[in-house]
């Protein structure tokens, strides 16, 4: 059994920045976004279903799926977004389970952006939230994705509200600036804390693999 810490947060909150810092100190990271991308690229059955559903408007010239175009498409159509999540999510969970089974360390970081939206928080022992003020999320989205403020607000509106994420989380990192030194201190502290929790001899503290 392994102690699973789920890392989550809203769009452009800095989840990748934090998970990369954990990687640098040797923590095993399972990122569901990365798993999802690979499924779309390599699972022919799923990729064919996506192409059939959305057509040429989400394809590159080589007939591969353009994730940016796909994302724009689903965020403008709620039913399409839910359809895509429903065909990807079971496969993502299955792949996550396989990867976690291979880990030999005492704890691992499971990065799940839609942890609360998909109501799977109980599959983790502890929840680490990367929290960012909405105004900063919007600013980062506009810069990263080249979208306007109304589009950014619409995307955020589809996610669980900030207050609810905070209330459901165990540990919180407030990420509103680029203070890497302070972030590194948090990462080292949390690593030691999670090692401590993982070594407690209470079976209830452990997950048998998601």
Curated annotation (Swiss-Prot):
Q: Where does the record place it? A: Cytoplasm
Summary of the function given for this chain in its UniProt record: Catalyzes the phosphorylation of the 3'-hydroxyl group of dephosphocoenzyme A to form coenzyme A.
Swiss-Prot/TrEMBL catalytic activity:
3'-dephospho-CoA + ATP = ADP + CoA + H(+)
BP terms from Gene Ontology: coenzyme A biosynthetic process
The record places domain DPCK at 4-201
Q: What is its main location?
A: cytoplasm
Annotated binding of ATP, by residue: 12-17
Family per similarity comment: Belongs to the CoaE family.
Which keywords does this chain's UniProt record carry? Answer: ATP-binding, Coenzyme A biosynthesis, Cytoplasm, Kinase, Nucleotide-binding, Transferase
InterPro entries annotated for this entry? Depp_CoAkinase, P-loop_NTPase
Q: Which GO CC annotations does the UniProt entry carry?
A: cytoplasm
User: Cell wall biogenesis/degradation: is it a keyword of this entry?
Assistant: no
The protein's name in its UniProt record? Dephospho-CoA kinase
What species is given as this protein's source?
A: Buchnera aphidicola subsp. Schizaphis graminum (strain Sg)
Specify whether Electron transport is a keyword of the entry: no
